[in-house]
Amino acid sequence: MLFKNPIIPGYNPDPSICRVGDDFYLVNSTFEFFPGVPIYHSRNLVNWELKGYCLDRRSQLELEGCRNSGGIYAPTIRFHNGMFYMITTNVTDKGNFVVHSDSVDGDWSEPAWIDQGGIDPSLFWDDDDKCYYCSTGILDGVRGIVAFEINPMTGEILSDKKLISEGCGGQCAEGPHIYKKDGMYYLMIAEGGTEYAHRAVSYTHLRAHETRSNL
């Protein structure tokens, strides 16, 4: 299929995509703008249609006093057991939170706030249906990527927090996403602070039976 970049023209930074059957859904940062976090839909990853917004009420998105490039940072969209989840950071308000909806065409929930600092949160479900949160953070004075089990409906933290990566020598480890394939866990992060040394980094972790006990 022929395509022309940009496939979604305009202001759409920090995209996150999830697949549900034959459908793809994409969200992106909106910073100081309202409504927040648009949802795009595609069947071929080339032609995209705007479906709506995750954050379209002030009770979901408080931007009073927001500076330029404040507000909503780096959302992640996920789908699990019939429910969509969007997790993000409002750097102008209370920090990290997650909202959910059983349909991208419906209303999204009120925010479930998460007691964890940092930015760029994402969610990962393991094979046992446990949900894990990861984001940037500081633990025991060490800066890196923090992870723990979470209830994604309420934001309740269900396990001890663990520092799972300090990066691999680059500046500002951020943007973490955890994936699992063939019994192996993969952590993907960005480093370099979006400047000249910016780069993507991928880690291969221990096999499933060795790793779950560590989280």
Language-model features: where?
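Hydrophobic core segments of beta-strands in well-ordered, beta-rich domains
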Residues: 16-33, 66, 73-91, 110-114, ...
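Beta-propeller domains
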Residues: 29-54
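Blade-loop segments of beta-propeller domains
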Residues: 50-80
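Structural motif
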Residues: 35-38, 94-97, 142-146, 196-202
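Surface loop/turn motifs at the tips and blade-to-blade linkers of beta-strand repeat domains
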Residues: 7-10, 67-68, 113-116, 165-170
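Short loop/turn segments that connect beta-strands within beta-propeller blades
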Residues: 43-45, 102-104, 151-153
